[in-house]
Swiss-Prot record:
Keywords attached to this entry: Antibiotic biosynthesis, Hydrolase
Gene: rdmC
Family, similarity comment: Belongs to the AB hydrolase superfamily. Hydrolase RdmC family.
Temperature dependence as stated in the record: Optimum temperature is 37 degrees Celsius. The activity at 30 and 45 degrees Celsius is 58% and 87% of the optimal activity, respectively. Exceptionally high temperature stability.
Protein's recorded name: Aclacinomycin methylesterase RdmC
Source lineage: Bacteria, Bacillati, Actinomycetota, Actinomycetes, Kitasatosporales
Pathway note: Antibiotic biosynthesis; aclacinomycin biosynthesis
Catalytic activity as recorded in UniProt: aclacinomycin T + H2O = 15-demethylaclacinomycin T + methanol
Enzyme Commission identifier(s): 3.1.1.95
The keyword Hydrolase is annotated on this UniProt entry: yes
Active site: S102, D248, H276
Domain of life, per lineage: Bacteria
Listed GO biological process terms: antibiotic biosynthetic process; glycerolipid catabolic process
Pfam family, any one: Abhydrolase_1
InterPro entries: AB_hydrolase (IPR050471), AB_hydrolase_1 (IPR000073), AB_hydrolase_fold (IPR029058)
Length: 298
């Protein structure tokens, strides 16, 4: 395991790796406002033990990557997709299997459209298609209105987690406890959730960010890619896996089925009991479907 700072335009991105660099590369793209440590070390090692060179990185404005005032230095999903490619360049990787979670699933769709030559395969989980306006859906759900796209909007557990995240926490212990409570809500009751495990991971994330207690927030200011870009996904030819978490409160079923339907090469898998979180109870089945997909794409 080693660390590397890579340039992407005028920002620097922190990254690290697991496994043998001689193995096929797999890039992990985390969700919004989360650093690379949103991918637990234990999960990354499980993928590496399956024969992959696993690379993860801090998005700009998270962790140890460049952090600036978003209003003064705005960016969009095009830049975030270019960041992912810059990480591959920084590790000397021509093509990689790319796995995107939540906002990372949106980023990986943009990678598939704008940087398709860098992909060996594509995996997306806990996310939706480029034609889904999640921001508008959240607002409509909060007003008690149906979504305009006909798919279910974010569920009450997400709204509960959002309200919790907006509550102040005094001191490190309170901040860790708040984060653990958030993840317990988002994970749901379908799989075991270990508070102590998540507390340990959040302690790591805080240390990784230099002891800063406030969670990053810049990505809340992002504008989603134009919904019209979803039509371009019909041209994607890279082997694609879409993973639906059975109890995802942010992108509930059938969002995964809808996303898979946008890409001719996509197939759909479901992780029973899983919510919008990565407790160790889902690491085994999740790694199993990802490894099977990357091997079939080799």
């Amino acid at each position: 395991m080693s660390e590397r700072i890579v340039p992407s335009g005028d920002v620097e991105l922190w990254s690290d790796d697991f496994g043998d660099p001689a193995d096929p590369a797999l890039l992990l793209v985390m969700g919004g406002n989360l650093s690379a440590l949103g991918w637990p070390d234990e999960f990354a090692r499980r993928l590496a033990d399956g024969g992959l060179h696993v690379i993860r990185y801090d998005h700009r404005d998270t962790g140890r990557s460049t952090t600036r005032d978003f209003a003064a230095h705005p960016y969009g999903f095009g830049e975030l997709a270019a960041d992912a490619v810059a990480v591959l360049d920084g590790w000397g990787v021509d093509r990689a299997h790319v796995v995107g979670l939540s906002m990372g699933a949106t980023i990986t769709q943009v990678i598939a459209l704008d940087h398709h030559d860098r992909l060996s395969s594509l995996t997306m989980l806990l996310g939706g298609g480029l034609d889904i306006d999640f921001d508008a859906n959240i607002e409509r759900v909060m007003r008690g209105e149906p979504t305009l796209d006909g798919l279910p909007g974010p569920q009450q557990p997400f709204l509960d987690a959002l309200a919790l995240m907006n509550q102040p926490a005094e001191g490190r212990a309170a901040e860790v406890a708040k984060r653990v409570s958030k993840w317990r809500i988002l994970s749901g009751t379908g799989v075991p959730f270990d508070d102590a495990e998540y507390a340990r991971w959040e302690e790591r994330a805080i240390d990784h960010a230099g002891g800063v207690l406030a969670e990053p927030y810049a990505h809340y200011s992002l504008t989603l890619p134009p919904p019209s870009r979803a039509a371009e996904l019909r041209e994607v030819t890279v082997p694609t896996l879409v993973i639906q978490a059975e109890h995802d409160p942010i992108a509930p079923a059938p969002h995964g089925k809808h996303l898979a339907g946008l890409i001719p090469t996509a197939r759909l898998a479901e992780i029973p009991g899983m919510g919008h979180a990565l407790p160790s109870s889902v690491h085994g089945p999740l790694a199993e479907v990802i490894l099977a997909h990357t091997r079939s794409a080799a």
